[in-house]
């Protein structure tokens, strides 16, 4: 039986809106640090309505881990809810950035 030497990772893209106490608590900086540690590309930004929006692109399991960390382990934030929308990955990002 033939098995490929390596199976490419399943790439994913998630757009996440974080709700709760998420602005003014270093959420974006911590999000960027975690995404960089995990090798995820995309961005995070504050929205005018007081929410934080992020787009994560990378290996699906790693993206899921990053969403979980940002939802439940952000040091100073309180995330009441995270709304996740899965999208087709585009490969448009070269790094993870904080947008202003």
Q: What residues fall within each predicted segment?
A:
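Intrinsically disordered, low-complexity, mixed-charge
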Residues: 1-100
């Amino acid at each position: 039986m033939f098995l490929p030497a390596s199976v490419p990772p399943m790439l994913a893209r998630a757009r996440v809106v974080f709700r709760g106490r998420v602005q003014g608590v270093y959420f974006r900086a911590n999000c960027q640090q975690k995404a960089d540690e995990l090798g995820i590309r995309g961005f995070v930004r504050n929205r005018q309505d007081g929410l934080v929006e992020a787009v994560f692109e990378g290996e699906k399991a790693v993206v899921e881990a990053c969403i979980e960390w940002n939802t439940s382990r952000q040091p100073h934030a309180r995330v009441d809810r995270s709304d996740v929308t899965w999208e087709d990955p585009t490969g448009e990002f070269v790094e993870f950035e904080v947008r202003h």
